[in-house]
Amino acid sequence: MAILIKNKVPTTLYQVYDNEGKLMDPNHKITLSNEQLKHAFYLMNLSRIMDKKMLVWQRAGKMLNFAPNLGEEALQVGMGMGLNENDWFCPTFRSGALMLYRGVKPEQLLLYWNGNENGSKIEAKYKTLPINITIGAQYSHAAGLGYMLHYKKLPNVAVTMIGDGGTAEGEFYEAMNIASIHKWNSVFCINNNQFAISTRTKLESAVSDLSTKAIAVNIPRIRVDGNDLIASYEAMHEAANYARSGNGPVLIEFFSWRQGPHTTSDDPSIYRTKEEEAEAMKSDPVKRLRNFLFDRGILTPQQEEEMVAKIEQEVQAAYEVMVSKTPVTLDEVFDYNYEKLTPDLARQKAEAKKYFKD
């Protein structure tokens, strides 16, 4: 398989199966096992059911504002499947499905989005940084970790993603440029869900093919159907192997559709039509993978029903953990990262204690 593009020819959108779950090329060799595919389907459903329940809880005042992953489950789980356990992931705020794949527990994501810093205490073995809200900063994190891996001659990569709107940020270019110059072990990804909050791609970028932004920094690129789990896996697998082999970074654009709001404070009905949404849902990633699994006899409707019931219980249990956790103390907010506070942080801590006491 060779899907990396290294020159200025038009980028083709890489796909493995269509909306009905049929292979685009009947001779295409699937390298994932049936168990891996079923596990991927489980995680995609876990992410989706969590998001739907979180939306209900948030509307009922039982959770704070959050960014749903609806419609982007396949690209995130596919990314995770293409990585090794010792590869690093630098999340953005819409990375829930991939974080679940990496081993982060559902209750940690719920805690994070409910304002409890315990949600950011991710075990070191998962090689996953805390969620990053500042758009673009995660690209610098992935470049820096890629530098570390390159410097130590480790056969691993650092991976991150950004939304289509985030490609207008300076750090998007700066991180790729320095990683390209020094051939660091980084894989940069774009989750092109076609909306930067309410702004369409054509109003935020002069090119509709965002993967071509790789040309300016002289790195190879892949443009992949982000609603196709297997295509997303194969794209990440190839890009990661390229970067871990000392060839330098790769840029992957996952073309998708954001089904839900940007965050729960957003109303998509203001800037897109029901007809657009209905058309986009024909390529729903969960439905497409279900069709693929059913068509090949890997999963049955009864097995799916049992899976969903199990997930419903798992998510409810995670919610119960979330509500049982008390918020962290002010001391812990400041003391968690440092053995000894810097003078600036010590001053800020004293100011915070006075403020909250008053």
From Swiss-Prot:
One of its GO terms (biological process) is branched-chain amino acid catabolic process. InterPro entries: Alpha-ketoacid_DH_E1_comp, DH_E1, PdhA/BkdA, THDP-binding. It comes from the Bacteria. Its cofactor is thiamine diphosphate. GO terms for molecular function: pyruvate dehydrogenase (acetyl-transferring) activity. Keywords: Oxidoreductase, Pyruvate, Thiamine pyrophosphate. Pfam families: E1_dh (PF00676). Its EC number is 1.2.4.1. Gene3D superfamilies: 3.40.50.970. It catalyses: N(6)-[(R)-lipoyl]-L-lysyl-[protein] + pyruvate + H(+) = N(6)-[(R)-S(8)-acetyldihydrolipoyl]-L-lysyl-[protein] + CO2. CDD domains: TPP_E1_PDC_ADC_BCADC. One of its GO terms (cellular component) is cell surface. The pyruvate dehydrogenase complex catalyzes the overall conversion of pyruvate to acetyl-CoA and CO(2). It contains multiple copies of three enzymatic components: pyruvate dehydrogenase (E1), dihydrolipoamide acetyltransferase (E2) and lipoamide dehydrogenase (E3). Heterodimer of an alpha and a beta chain. This is Pyruvate dehydrogenase E1 component subunit alpha. It comes from Mycoplasma pneumoniae (strain ATCC 29342 / M129 / Subtype 1) (Mycoplasmoides pneumoniae).
